[in-house]
Regions:
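A glycine-rich, hydrophobic/aromatic-adjacent loop/helix-cap motif
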Residues: 2-169
């Protein structure tokens, strides 16, 4: 099994060079913000939910391998999605702090939303915000000095798209 399912920054193809990327959906998982003790910020993770269909990106590790992706996804563990013949990363419970709400880096969210907009359009962005839980984490505006290591350059329209959805929360 060499394919993975990305539901956050891996949806944005500017952040990686894995093979054969294509938009896809999986059923039975919901996305949520969790506090990471490794990164000292909020990260996206998933948990089981029979009612949810999650949009994301499927790609193959054949060209770079799992080791490089495992390193990128430090603080996550791989989980097999046997019904889909692929794997995805889930926030490692050992490194998640449920007692505190660490901040969501705006540069991270911008990167994620840029990917969703490019591959799923405005409706995909809307679904991302609606299908993601734990928006009660503070937002850290680091756009002028991005802390996210794979921050991307957004258009004014994309910045506004993120800001408009945050205002509606």
């Amino acid at each position: 099994m060499t394919d993975f399912f990305g539901y956050g920054s891996l949806v944005n193809l500017q952040t990686h060079q894995y093979l054969n990327p294509r938009p896809t959906k999986i059923k039975g998982w919901k996305r949520k913000w969790v506090s990471s003790n490794i990164h000292d910020i909020a990260i996206l993770s998933v948990s089981p939910c029979d009612l949810t269909i999650l949009q994301g990106m499927r790609a193959s590790t054949k060209n770079i391998g799992w080791k490089a992706l495992d390193l990128r996804e430090t603080g996550y563990i791989r989980h097999s999605l046997d019904n889909y013949n692929m794997q995805m990363y889930i926030g490692d419970p050992e490194y998640i702090d449920h007692k505190i709400k660490k901040p969501i880096l705006l540069s991270y969210l911008d990167c994620v939303i840029q990917g969703y907009y490019k591959h799923f359009g405005k409706q995909g962005v809307k679904r991302f915000f609606k299908s993601t839980e734990n928006w009660d984490h503070p937002i850290l505006d680091d756009r002028n000095a991005p802390q996210y290591p794979r921050a991307t350059i957004l258009s004014k329209f994309e910045f506004n798209l993120v800001d408009e959805h945050l205002e509606r929360l």
